[in-house]
Amino acid sequence: MNRLTTPLIARIPGSKSITNRALLLAAASAGDTRLSAPLISEDTLAFRTALTDLGIRITDADTGWDIRGGGRGPTVGATTSVACADAGTAARFLPPFAATGRGEFVFDGSDQLRARPLRPLVDALGALGARVSCGPAGALPLTVAADGLDGGDLDLDSSFSSQYLTGLLMAAPLMRRALTVRAKALVSRPYIDMTLALMRHFGATAEDHGDGTITVRPGGYRAADLTVEPDASTASYVLAAAAVTGRGVTVPGLGGTSLQGDLGFAHVLRRTGAHVAVTDAGTTVTGRPDGSLTGGFAVDMGDISDTFMTLAAIAPLADAPITIHGIGHARFKESDRIEAVARNLAALGIRTEQGPDRITIHPGATGPAEIACYRDHRIAMAFSVLGLRAGGITLDDPSCVGKTFPGFHAELRRLFPDHTTPQGI
């Protein structure tokens, strides 16, 4: 094989979703857990710090982090402040865990995090016996006066995010009796599958009834070591880069046995004409030699919405429009991601149409523009991929990638030294 046909080997850090779930499950377990190859980024460090605010002992180890779990919810004698920074997972996963303990906990975060909705979680915790209050907009700051959670039956609006359900499920083994949740209009279902798999790894008993109803039995968790696989959402950027540059890129360790639904993005790339190979050892995407993309299709990315911007950013390079739908909940992430994508594509001279849960991107030549990142790491990374093919792209906040992949820009330059990466990096 020559240089152009030998796949490039991408260095993708550990999954944020797995890292933060495993941190919490280890903290709730009885005993010591070694978490190997965790993602080390702003979001996971914020989650780790929030757990230490709750009294959990976490120390650095050669291969990752050691967590000493207490086998129960946290107990404090005085009001305890918990800093979530920008980490939405901390704001949504940790209050249910705290509610299974004893004491008063006050959760707060950045202005960006204060703008993200928490009302469904607050209402659910109240229904389970917790005393909870939040800001006037149904968001942070959130106060939990904890005295354990009862469990029982619960209907949960899951149309904004699957993270409310995830937080409640992970706390359920610490409740006084079984929890049965009926998730209404559940989005991002693969993240719930991931959560249940990790809960079972740590010894929980959970039954998925297959109709949006899940029952979790009390009984706690037991410590269990875990190695974190590469982040599939992050991998979407280098796999898309392979498609638009005509190269092959392999992500080792992210294969057919992955816990992450976002690996499904590779199959979306297959619809654009890229060659995709998924084995147990890893995933390889190879673009057409000229980097051309086939459009003219619509795709539901509701279950893998963290990757929709990756497709949207490269869609102008296709030969026909591409419509992405089922992503209405992406309007409530770090930014209104549908609107942010549309505005940035318009700045580049690309025509789009959007609806409440969809966006259509038309092909076209892009002009120079500064991308508005809105402090959203995924906007910066997605449009950086387009920048490999489209000259004159700059980012107004290139450092925001530190939320999940601090080394992103360096890795993109390493993989594609013959292509221009966006200026300002």
Residues of each region from the PLM?
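Short, structured segments at the rim of ligand-binding sites
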Residues: 1-425
